[in-house]
């Protein structure tokens, strides 16, 4: 018996293994008449690429079309996985706001302006990288604050926070806040404002933008230039890149408000030149809305220089031929900007208390008006409304790659406590000053081993005070 011939059991039917007898000359292996391989299991065979092959199909048909099963089989698994991942990432970075077409239109204008090299301009004030976004006419339409350029972000272009971290690391950051979540805090404040119908926060949402004026790492800029060069010199290679330009940055996109000035400027003017009674009433009502917003989100960075006042006292000419004029009633509006340091996971209890600086204003000593009670109390007294607010914030905050459910529960527990105190203060007819003097409360969801259709909560007071307390 030849050593190279296959071993066959003596009891097995003798099968003809003379492959050449059933095949055309030059073909080492062929199929048996019944369409099966005429070979012993375990023997390596080579299947001919003939036109009658039931597996390969027609050899003359050429390469398989893209997307066909054969084409997908030939594509490496790693490459397919990377392609799907790149497509998913591109979908996440697409700015879509179906529920707010007006906001979507502003974002589209900003994107078109960037394509035409009308780039965002960095704002010199502040301790983080923030930018004035313009339209194609060069007009400022929004303020964009990238996540990684926040006060404690890795690419913050302002050196003040870097110097603070280097020289005084023990006082660096705010331990009551979730770091690098300022863009979500900005968008969350706008969400709370809309839910409560306060209408004092310019609409703010999470947006992806890319611009040469943003602060990128050297590696990102080199990669971008290399990809552009490859696309110009070797188009076949450059077309395989998922992205050619700089990577988009995620951040808060807040609509720009015109005609406003720092509150400190107008408050000094009003102190020297008191407002008429009706106008002063408008200011008080707007101020109370600011108090409600700041208190619920527990804003840790509210001074008199980061909220705005617009004071209009228009005069229309009644006739061009005489000096008669019609004086309209002045209009006052407040815009609450810079909400990036809110939604703490605990009440401040370390070095600083981070007070509300509006608490020292004369307006803070006046009891809450009936108008603000009628607007706010029916909402925050309704458990279903509060639950919906929590769910909306959850859908917003979970978009962050570093989202932590445990930290979010702590943030919501603080917010529930603030809502509880505010509800009681409005019912008792207190003033904003008396409200901020109320002991801070945390309302957590109670853990139960038994299933229940309704949630229960536990209430606790914070006994520890900051080292530098303001009361």
Curated annotation (Swiss-Prot):
Q: Which InterPro entries does the record associate with it?
A: Lsb6/PI4K2, PI3/4_kinase_cat_dom
Name the family the entry cites. Answer: Belongs to the PI3/PI4-kinase family. Type II PI4K subfamily.
Q: How does it sit in the membrane?
A: Lipid-anchor
The biased composition feature labelled Basic and acidic residues covers 90-101
According to its UniProt entry, this protein's organism is: Xenopus tropicalis (Western clawed frog)
Q: Where is this region: Catalytic loop?
A: 298-306
Q: List GO BP terms, alphabetically.
A: phosphatidylinositol biosynthetic process; phosphatidylinositol phosphate biosynthetic process
Q: What is this protein called?
A: Phosphatidylinositol 4-kinase type 2-alpha
Mention one GO molecular function.
ATP binding
| Catalysed conversion reaction | a 1,2-diacyl-sn-glycero-3-phospho-(1D-myo-inositol) + ATP = a 1,2-diacyl-sn-glycero-3-phospho-(1D-myo-inositol 4-phosphate) + ADP + H(+)
